[in-house]
């Protein structure tokens, strides 16, 4: 059998099957029944809406337009106190972040009830020489961005933070964002070095959102 004949047979089989696949209800009435009850046909509809959970911290896709996508960019926030500032207890603002100045866009969009948010670090930030700075020395301050209420930020810890629970309204839909501003509290004099970094020396924090 050549390819052309095979394709014709396949097309014919599909054509024969189409009425079966696309069949719908039909009803015939004759005589007086054409006036009452008349001919009726029914169609059933189903709309399948997937659960959606979107989390953004830093660089990411737009989320106010409905075009939610994934973006693998990981931002780096850097704190650089001067020698005179080290350990003086005055908080040091960061550099970097998608909003600059150590400020990140944070957003949650969901459609199926309450959302639980937390942050996990492997341990204290290290310098590779045995010295550490605890994540409790990095403070996150949440302020409003576009939503009426700012998205709360988990308090960073040398491990998994306490949960932040976002309570969904009756619609079960959450759209909440904030500007998260990071600061190094600078409460102690520590040995010189680069603590943490881009996914090295426990420098990475993983934020996780979950939804039932």
Which stretches of residues belong to each language-model region?
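Bacterial N-terminal signal peptides that target proteins for export
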Residues: 1-10
